[in-house]
Curated annotation (Swiss-Prot):
Source species of the chain: Shewanella amazonensis (strain ATCC BAA-1098 / SB2B)
Main location group: cytoplasm
Lineage per the UniProt record: Bacteria, Pseudomonadati, Pseudomonadota, Gammaproteobacteria, Alteromonadales
Binding annotation for UDP-N-acetyl-alpha-D-glucosamine: 8-11, 22, 73, 78-79, 100-102, 137, 151, 166, 224, 330, 348, 363, 374
Positions annotated to bind acetyl-CoA: A377, N383, Y384, S402, A420, R437
Annotated protein name in UniProt: Bifunctional protein GlmU
GO cellular component, one term: cytoplasm
Pathway(s) the chain acts in: Nucleotide-sugar biosynthesis; UDP-N-acetyl-alpha-D-glucosamine biosynthesis; N-acetyl-alpha-D-glucosamine 1-phosphate from alpha-D-glucosamine 6-phosphate (route II): step 2/2; Nucleotide-sugar biosynthesis; UDP-N-acetyl-alpha-D-glucosamine biosynthesis; UDP-N-acetyl-alpha-D-glucosamine from N-acetyl-alpha-D-glucosamine 1-phosphate: step 1/1; Bacterial outer membrane biogenesis; LPS lipid A biosynthesis
Enzyme class: transferase
Annotated spans, Linker: 227-247
Active site: residue positions: H360
Record flagged with keyword Nucleotidyltransferase: yes
Record-level GO BP terms: cell morphogenesis; cell wall organization; lipid A biosynthetic process; peptidoglycan biosynthetic process; regulation of cell shape; UDP-N-acetylglucosamine biosynthetic process
Amino acid sequence: MSLNVVILAAGKGTRMRSDLPKVLHSVAHKPMVQHVIDTARELNADNINLVYGYGGELLKAKLGEQPLNFVLQAEQLGTGHAVAQAIDHINDEDTVLVLYGDVPLTRKETLEALLAARQPDGVAVLTVHLDNPTGYGRMVREGGKVVGIVEQKDASPEQLKINEINSGIMALPGKRLKAWLGRLENNNAQGEFYLTDVIAMAHADGVAIDTAHPANPIETEGANNRVQLAALERAYQARRAEELMLAGANLRDPARIDIRGDVTVGMDVMIDVNVIFEGTVKLGNNVTIGAGAILIDCDIADNADIKPYSIIEGAKLGDSASAGPFARLRPGAELHKDAHIGNFVEMKKAVLGEGSKAGHLAYLGDAEIGKGVNIGAGTITCNYDGANKHLTVIEDNVFVGSDTQLVAPVVIRKGATLGAGSTVTHEVGENELVITRVKQRHIQGWQRPVKKPK
């Protein structure tokens, strides 16, 4: 039996006040609909159909490289009409799971429970009990069994008292669903074809209707405006912060962290406030992350220390390495064990060897730097000639004085010393001292220029 997912994503989202389709608005730096697609993939869905309307070209541009069936709903005539647009992609033997592109926080485990609750050839609906169910469709039961769903605008005063609401998420048998969709009518207050009407049809046909419930109602909430979108963002971040703490991270303030990707942590990790994670980030044991740091697609080994306001992107830090404050590691940068870069040091496609240090104010690009090297303040590897990048090699135990320019391609051999203010353009031999600065001159009685009157 195949799992066939239908994601409803045709709404314009007028209340967002945006040219962007509602489902492309982001939670954790990812479109809401992408969260839904990713969850469907976690369920090993055999087929995913995305029913779209407004902004179809934008949706395809953003999502089109994925294996999806894009299905147009030219007119928004209700949820039942939307699902019916995907009927050509549904086989009789399929289990059809209906999801919503603006409901991004539904967990895989919740959907697994929903699918498990569905009896063979039966229907299962994800429902929630709310203290204030206003605005939602109500689950109508008789003798404890579901017999139908009534929308808010069509509900009687007695039905409005029901606090079990329909989330809209449901699992249905493919063959029966296709038959029910063909029988839908729009004689209701909205003049729409409701998917929820198939529940009454299922009851009339003697089909078993079961329910499942999320651990938290936030899993079924969508976003119709930016206030609700912000609430989803906070809920998502709270969930991810809890996951990190349970995995061994100590968060200085769980409400002040921003996780926009996949973060794995070792034991006794310390994360200060306002840290941002993007992409895939791995933190080893006893790692410390200072306030305001940004980590993107990086691998941080045990005991490493990232000080406040550093940006680490596409980089690796070895055991007990440290960076910052205000350091920037760009893609291809790597600090080996016990290496250190300080404030306002930038590295790109550069390796800093074990125990080497660049304390402050340096640019190290396209460089291979050995062990025990000292990089003085103001050092620059001049790696670009206007057309191509070139490599600088600094071997072990080299001392580079402050304000030194290394014009690549160039090699500095073991134990060499470069005097402050030098511009090095040729290879330096082992244990050599190189000084290239101009000889100091003294001019007595020097008169400074005088400003001319305006």
